[in-house]
Amino acid sequence: MNIGEASKVSGVSSKMIRYYEQIGLISPAVRTASSYRTYGDNDVHTLRFIRRARDLGFSVEQIKELLALWRDRSRASSDVKAVALEHIAELERKIAAIQDMTRTLKHLASHCHGDGRPDCPIIEEMAKGGGAAKTEINPRFGVASLK
């Protein structure tokens, strides 16, 4: 099947199929005499695996590892579980960070008058700049702020 057909049956866009081929997630496609890519059922199965892994938020590197484990019939399920547990821990860290940002923004928004005044704790916090968000108490507003 051509790339359009493979895209349709796998649920992966043609652009992403080319990208996955470029970075080595899938094997280079067989080419016709006119240089069109052709894909078989195994390729589509691999693309569906990749799509599902992406849907679960796995990184490209993690997907490479999962694909290697999937292809290894002598794999230990403990290896697969370790990748999944590592990913769960990362997702939980991201959730905690998002919850922290949400709490901070809610607190700042509750202290912004939202009227014609020019002063606003939200703008003042963002104007401080800085690197990664870290929660800290801001004595001026008595709120958690981003540092």
Curated annotation (Swiss-Prot):
Give the signal peptide range: none
PROSITE patterns tied to this protein: HTH_MERR_1, HTH_MERR_2
Entry annotated with the keyword Ribosomal protein: no
Gene3D superfamilies in the record, alphabetically?
Answer: 1.10.1660.10
In the UniProt record, which is one GO cellular component term?
A: cytoplasm
Q: What is its main location?
A: cytoplasm
Specify the DNA-binding region ranges: 4-23
- Known InterPro entries for this protein? CueR (IPR011789), DNA-bd_dom_put_sf (IPR009061), MerR-type_HTH_dom (IPR000551), MerR_fam (IPR047057), Tscrpt_reg_MerR_DNA-bd (IPR015358)
Positions of disulphide bridges: none
Q: Name one Pfam family in it.
A: MerR
An example of a GO molecular function for this protein is:
DNA-binding transcription factor activity
Q: Where in the cell is it found?
A: Cytoplasm
- Keywords in alphabetical order: Activator, Copper, Cytoplasm, DNA-binding, Plasmid, Repressor, Transcription, Transcription regulation
- What GO biological process term is on the record, naming one? positive regulation of DNA-templated transcription
Residue intervals of the HTH merR-type domain? 1-69
Assembly notes:
Homodimer.
Q: What does this protein do?
A: Regulates the transcription of actP. It detects cytoplasmic copper stress and activates transcription in response to increasing copper concentrations. In the absence of copper, it negatively regulates the transcription of actP.
> What protein name is recorded for this chain?
HTH-type transcriptional regulator HmrR
Annotated organism of origin: Sinorhizobium medicae (strain WSM419)
